[in-house]
Amino acid sequence: MAAEQGLANAGRGAQSPAAAAPVPGRFVVFAIVSLALLMASVDQTIVATALPALQHDLHAQVNWSSWTITIYALGQILVMPLAGKIGDQYGRKRIFLGAAVLFTTASLCCGFANDIYLLIVLRACQAIGGGAFMPSATGIVAQIFGPNRDRAVGLFASIFPIGGIIGPVLGGVFVTYWSWRGIFLVNVPIGIALVTLGAVFIPASARNRGQRLDISGILLLGATLLSAMFGIAYLGSGASSPADPAFLVPECAAAVALILFVRHCARAPAPFVSVRFLAGHGFGVMNLLNFLFGSAALGFAALVPLYAQERYGLATLAAGTLLTARAAGMIATAGLAVFLLRRTGYRWPILVGFTLTAVGLLAIAASPPGVSAYGWMALAAGVCGVGMGVSTPAANNATLQLAPDQAAAVAGLRGMFRQSGSITAVSITAAIAARSADPGMAQAHVFLVFAAILLCALPLILLVPEHRGRW
């Protein structure tokens, strides 16, 4: 979902004179940047399957090992808007190649990390590279395809979900037949090829130095999420209680940073997020729903492989394929949901989708009724995927229609709230599991809470801006 921000920015570079006609060799360039996007998207999910092996080798608790997932998402939230604007100012090719070098170097170092804290820092570096790939690559595609940029960008956007299917399975293969270190080292030869081919084939782009970067806003948002994550992780270590200053100080710092972030957005001339997009007409309810959806649906995706291994003892490769069932459910229904949007409007698909996702979460948490654990969880994951496929297009359009002339900013806002929800859910769940004598059952109880949150949010859907037909 974080990728939406970069993908939505495609139209900005498309208006330059350089984009007036298709560029020779554009299909080679398309293949290069598509491979980069696929690599970055795979790294969003590949670590989830490898968490137990990673924890064992690095002697880490789940509350800290889960940071290898959440820090990657956090880094992308913060980097993508920066990378998009810097690419416009200094050239997308430079940003793309710099991102490829950073991502490849960080991947190599991740593969040889012998400490969980060092691995977390290196994953943050990976996130900077991966987050910069998306807006720069999308701008390159929009530039080189000229009048056909709409179809090219649409096809390019469809590549990102493929990583969600490949990642967990690929992670399971590496852990089963080699080592968790392989999930990072596999990026190195690919990254070297990207840098070499990109330097030769990607054309330079025009520069636009008229945009300002809201560094203060991005730092305040980063401080909010990072402080909250740190306090929750420390609580999960079992060395503190909710009354311990080691927990309270970071959480209070997060609250202060959040207040300052909102205040900054209200006063800055060119804020990272317009205050109108935070609480303006229709935005408040959509932001809340996107946050809750990210907590339940995206947090679920990050945690299911670990849950399957800890509660049922499933093999790593089998646990990874559970997310393939979720992705299959999404793919099977999302296209139909998009086709029917003009007839159904937005509220009904979101209502049905949230309900189905909640049912899937309830099933995941329940004990298998006389069937294999793998079969039951695959079915439940598929139901969650169907729910996500039904609701996501409607939620996307309902948010975009609030400000169709600022689609890039709105898509980025939507991705920010969903990823923030995911980060919050994974951090809290990991802390609870780390303090529990039975981590598998603890995660099952968290899935029940996720389901309850989605069901309690159903009345809010009545406040979603409704629309049928074209817009």
Locations of regions flagged by a protein language model:
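Helix-loop-helix hairpin linking two adjacent transmembrane segments in secondary transporters
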Residues: I162-T196, L213-E251
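12-transmembrane solute porter fold
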Residues: G25-V42, V47-L51, V62-I71, L82, ...
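Short loop segments and helix-boundary regions at transmembrane helix junctions
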Residues: F27, R149, I202-L219, A239-A243, ...
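Residue-level signal for the membrane-embedded core of alpha-helical transmembrane segments
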Residues: L78, A132, A193, A223-L226, ...
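Interfacial helix-loop-helix linkers and transmembrane-helix boundary segments
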Residues: G87-R94, N148-A152, R207-L213, P271-S274, ...
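C-terminal membrane-cytosol helix-exit motif in multi-pass small-molecule transporters
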Residues: V188-R207, G222-Y234, A253-A268, A457-P465
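Transmembrane-helix bundle of Major Facilitator Superfamily
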Residues: A2-V200, L336, R343-T344, V352-T355, ...
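A residue-level signal for alpha-helical anchor/packing sites in multi-pass solute transporters
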Residues: G139-I140, I144, V173, F201, ...
